[in-house]
Amino acid sequence: MGFTDETVRFNLNDGDKNEISNTLTNVYRSLAEKGYNPINQIVGYVLSGDPAYVPRYNDARNQIRKYERDEIVEELVRYYLKGNGTDL
């Protein structure tokens, strides 16, 4: 599949946004409980897609794999922008 010069729309429904946020929080806690640096591990997963960055502990690996990585990135960007005063 090739690239286009046309702008493409990407939409994520509101229900998924809340679920992704909750999942990231749960995964973060599971990683911290196991002694990992949660931010580094989540970034490793998002960039590579390799689920080995997230442990099976507390079902964290299965939870995060329910979502496409682009959906996770969208939620992270939205959260960051809202936290910095951007009106979305």
Curated annotation (Swiss-Prot):
Record-stated family: Belongs to the UPF0297 family.
Highest taxon of the lineage: Bacteria
Matches recorded under InterPro entries: IreB
Source organism per UniProt: Streptococcus thermophilus (strain ATCC BAA-491 / LMD-9)
Name this polypeptide is given: UPF0297 protein STER_1937
